[in-house]
């Protein structure tokens, strides 16, 4: 796969806030599983969810100078099959993520 450009930290932060939102986001366990599946090191699982995700994404980008595995994580997090029983949550997350991804 071709290297995708790094994302600005402001975009990463807001994506992390969407994905790890207390009410509508992934659980800590889900975040850990998806980080492992995307081959991104979980740098500090004791932090709040969005900070944990932000630090993992930032470390990945700083080391690899691309956003490939972050995009893999997001693709896995938003797979429609994960939302068969809750299509409204899928629509919400997709809408919120796209608001930030349009800046990339």
Predicted segments, located by residue:
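Charged interaction/catalytic cores of defense and host-pathogen modules
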Residues: 1-104
């Amino acid at each position: 796969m071709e290297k995708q450009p790094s994302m600005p930290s402001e975009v990463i932060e807001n994506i992390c806030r969407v994905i790890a939102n207390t009410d509508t986001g992934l659980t800590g366990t889900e975040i850990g599983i998806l980080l492992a599946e995307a081959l991104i090191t979980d740098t500090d699982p004791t932090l709040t969810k969005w900070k944990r995700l932000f630090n993992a994404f930032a470390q990945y980008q700083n080391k690899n100078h691309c956003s490939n595995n972050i995009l893999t994580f997001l693709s896995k997090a938003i797979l429609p099959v994960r939302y068969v029983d809750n299509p409204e949550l899928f629509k919400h997350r997709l809408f919120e993520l796209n608001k930030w991804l349009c800046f990339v």
